[in-house]
Amino acid sequence: MTTRIERPLSPHLQAYRVTLTMAMSIIHRITGVALYFGTLLLAWWLIAAASGPGAYANVQAFTSSFIGRLIVFGYTWALLHHLLSGVRHFVWDLGYGFKPGEREALTWGALIGGISLTILLWIAAYAIGGGR
């Protein structure tokens, strides 16, 4: 007969208070998955561009609709957020930014930077006539 050994249990997720850094780590993973599916849409656009005017017009009709622009806007944000969050992880890999204040500053920088760069990129795209 085997003897049961009482081992300590790992704390459940409910034992932790969710911090911004934890939430951003989860969002980094989610944006990575979103980029995978968004890249399929990008490939669809490139294949349509190579296939001819009819196929390209179909893709343009979708991406110029409200839902299409919302998806492209989300893809842009996911790309820029994932990029900046990746830089944050790279800084950590170098051994910097682990103090609570530094960690929070990097996290806020990635969050605000991703949103700001997305908005600036879309403003620039519309300014040069990309939003026709």
What residues fall within each predicted segment?
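Membrane-embedded alpha-helical bundles that constitute the cytochrome b-like, heme-associated redox core
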Residues: 1-132
